[in-house]
Amino acid sequence: RDPDEDDVTPPTVAVTRPGDLWLLGKHRLLCADSRDAAAVARLLDGERAHLLFTSPPYANQRDYTTGGIANWDALMQGVFGAARAALREDAQILVNLGLVHRDNEWQPYWDGWIEWMRSQGWRRFGWYVWDQSVTVPGDWAGRLAPRHEFVFHFNRRSRKPNKTVPCTWAGHETHLRADGSSTAMR
């Protein structure tokens, strides 16, 4: 049996329990409710985040194991309310959301939450389109198949973004042919 196969059946009873904290090198992963400020504080261990990038559920589009989301705005307000104390004053928040269609039209389900974010001092700094390039197969009820999602960008004040990360291999040949010669075009 190939351990990399995708047909592995998950256990009937989950191994991870709420409160489990996993230390993964410099990273930390906590099984908890993001609306719980104490859990968020435990995860960050005294640090404050520069960036929160998340992809929450899109409205009440799916039936999760919890039975769905009764109030999407309340869920989002709880999550971002708890996050406030965990973020630096110059933090950036990016939230990936997709379209939801009901009654044969797309729904601006995010409007109430976006206004709530503004009332909490978060500016609508940017609104981006994530081009996913590959169309998702399926019956789209006469609409073109979606190939994008939105990314909403909030902040309290402008901060020039650091768009680069130092590269360990800068200046080194990393793409060599089997014979050891360089693939770099010179």
Which residue ranges define each predicted feature?
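Core catalytic lobe of class I
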Residues: R1-R186
